[in-house]
Amino acid sequence: MPRPLACLTAFALTALAASPLHAQEAAELCKAIGNVTLGQWASYTMSGGQADGAKIRLAIVGQERRGDSTLYWFEINGSGPRDEGIMQVLVPGFGLETSGIRGMVVKTGAQPAMKLPDQMLATVSQRMAANNPALLIARRCATAQVVGWETVAVPAGSIKALHLKDSEGGEAWMSRDIPFGIVKAHSKDGEDLVLTGRGMDAKSSITEKPMELPGMMIPHQ
């Protein structure tokens, strides 16, 4: 995973793992930010540590109907001083359901976009459950320690957000009015993430047709 994407995961983990306080208030916020709409996006910059200068965008760039369910293409686009990459996953919803991956496309730098075969998705789902920032926020948000509501000044404007904090110094400011909820975050390692933009007109960052990645060969016993 490119460094910017890994750092966003770390923010979610360190800023949202905390002791319960005002659990109902946090739970309502986390439920609200879990509702996604086609086209929603939020962009961020990072400062401090190895991710200094990195940029990240989260977006819902597509949807598909399968049976009675609507699936969404959730995109994480990250770029930093040394690497860049795009990951798109087809999921039944945001938050806890993000672990149920039904499709995945990845693109690293100038390399061709690749679509992963279905037999690899179970393994990827397990990794997403542990590392995906959106999933971690939904899972940890409701049990975080609530400091209180604050007005936070970020490049995207002044936004009222719920301040969450953990015992190790990680912090996050969350708002139901922001796509994906994250307004600002500070990790225990001194890295900062701030919201730079948001909107409802996101398009896929992958414009080419993805190549089919061959499936893994399973040896016969």
Could you tell me what each predicted segment is?
Residues 7-17:
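Bacterial N-terminal signal peptides
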Residues 24-100, 107-221:
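Acidic, serine/threonine-rich low-complexity disordered tracts
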Residues 1-4:
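Positively charged n-region of N-terminal signal peptides that target proteins for export
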Residues 19-23:
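Sec/Tat signal peptide C-region and signal peptidase I cleavage site
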